[in-house]
Amino acid sequence: MALPYHIFLFTVLLPSFTLTAPPPCRCMTSSSPYQEFLWRMQRPGNIDAPSYRSFSKGTPTFTAHTHMPRNCYHSATLCMHANTHYWTGKIINPSCPGGLGVTVCWTYFTHTGMSDGGGVQDQAREKHVKEVISQLTRVHSASRPYKGLDLSKLHETLRTHTRLVSLFNTTLTGLHEVSAQNPTNCWICLPLNFRPYVSIPVPEQWNNFSTEINTTSVLVGPLVSNLEITHTSNLTCVKFSNTTDTTNSQCIRWVTPPTQIVCLPSGIFFVCGTSAYRCLNGSSESMCFLSFLVPPMTIYTEQDLYNYVVSKPRNKRVPILPFVIGAGVLGALGTGIGGITTSTQFYYKLSQELNGDMERVADSLVTLQDQLNSLAAVVLQNRRALDLLTAERGGTCLFLGEECCYYVNQSGIVTEKVKEIRDRIQRRAEELRNTGPWGLLSQWMPWILPFLGPLAAIILLLLFGPCIFNLLVNFVSSRIEAVKLQMEPKMQSKTKIYRRPLDRPASPRSDVNDIKGTPPEEILTAQPLLRPNSAGSS
């Protein structure tokens, strides 16, 4: 039996595509031994001065850096150590870690948040991301027959990982040790989004340092960046020969390690700036201190979690859309014709946008209907194929022992509705095109006209009222002045005094009548004329 062509080609070409494992990494160091921090307890509660344990000479120790900039090497090749891939290359820049001309190793990926400037670490990460995306696309786009809902993957996703359970248990144990209330009912929550680790400085009095550190691999470089640092006081700080900041008041203890690479026990890190290190190469310009790293967990009591999840009801009402539109129209009326024009243009623009949205909705309905029609066609083809395959047993329905289902195509109703929507859209577009912004103003005239009469009367009264009032005042004043001028001669004739002749007998009554109403000056001038008669009579 002859093999198919593609199977034969695969069997022939398979040996040529066999991948070979990368060579072992040759980044071992045995001439200069590494040092490790060890704390020994002088008595419970106090930490003695640190001592150092050196590896014996000849002990091979693998050293790799976590970050290597692109300008530090010409080329890099893959190597393997302890079933882990690393990059190896020769240093060409004296300022890079390792030294000029030294062959060093560094990790396959750099840590999150850093870039090597387009080097092999960035390229490896980009390649890995593309592979994951293509794999997900291939899995989700594969056309497989429907076999019901497969919830096994969902169950695997929802199943809690063992390391996560261990992390929660450790956090709860630490909470019971440090909390005075010893809470029994609480919630320990992890954020779904990425958040940086939290740095907690190692206290001055702590008696849980490990005395035995067995390691054959050293990672030089930052492990975590962008830390959240808490309680920056009473720190145990580390200074090197090139450390400049040695007057920090937050440090209560300074430790000077040797010039060789210094590593810390598991669970303790050097924090320099906002980055965490497991090992330092004996030089650091910034101040470093010893710290723990914990995940960004949040601990809630039952009441706190209830208050956080269940928000308090708000008394603020949501404004109703017609009320908002009415308020805009009244505001336009209050600000005059300019406000009305602005409001009208705004509503015209809003109407145009709504018309465009309606067109997009119609297009979406047509697209969905086309997809449904194509899906229905595929289903009908599959049904015919199944009927042909199971024709000897009576067709698909008899073969499955189920009721037969038939597809009733009602796409014509959707097509008619879409046609009606398109006709309405076209009529509305023509109305908007013919009327324009000022045409919409005519639609508002039945509501505006009742207000125009009183408004015009008030405006006319304010404009011409002062002039009319001034004219009335001037007219009344002129008439009063004319009346005064006419009455002035009569008043002068009434005040004139007539002299009585000498041969006329004196009458007391007449004298009184003559001088009655006369001014005092005229009476005084008239008195000498009356004295001779009075003397003669006496």
Curated annotation (Swiss-Prot):
Any Pfam family hit: TLV_coat
Motif (CXXC): 186-189
UniProt KW keywords: Cell membrane, Cleavage on pair of basic residues, Disulfide bond, ERV, Glycoprotein, Membrane, Signal, Transmembrane, Transmembrane helix, Transposable element, Viral envelope protein, Virion
Membrane-spanning residues: 444-464
Cystine residue pairs: 186-189, 186-405, 397-404
An annotated GO BP: syncytium formation
Signal peptide: 1-20
InterPro entries: TLV/ENV_coat_polyprotein (IPR018154)
PTM description: Specific enzymatic cleavages in vivo yield mature proteins. Envelope glycoproteins are synthesized as an inactive precursor that is heavily N-glycosylated and processed likely by furin in the Golgi to yield the mature SU and TM proteins. The cleavage site between SU and TM requires the minimal sequence [KR]-X-[KR]-R. The CXXC motif is highly conserved across a broad range of retroviral envelope proteins. It is thought to participate in the formation of a labile disulfide bond possibly with the CX6CC motif present in the transmembrane protein.
Keyword NAD: no
Additional detail: Ortholog of the human HERV-W_7q21.2 envelope protein. The genome contains a high percentage of proviral-like elements, also called endogenous retroviruses (ERVs) that are the genomic traces of ancient infections of the germline by exogenous retroviruses. Although most of these elements are defective, some have conserved a functional envelope (env) gene, most probably diverted by the host for its benefit.
Function according to Swiss-Prot or TrEMBL: This endogenous retroviral envelope protein has retained its original fusogenic properties and participates in trophoblast fusion and the formation of a syncytium during placenta morphogenesis. May recognize and induce fusion through binding of SLC1A4 and SLC1A5.
Assembly notes: The mature envelope protein (Env) consists of a trimer of SU-TM heterodimers attached probably by a labile interchain disulfide bond. Interacts with the C-type lectin CD209/DC-SIGN.
Protein family per UniProt: Belongs to the gamma type-C retroviral envelope protein family. HERV class-I W env subfamily.
Name the record gives this protein: Syncytin-1
Gene name tied to this protein: ERVW-1
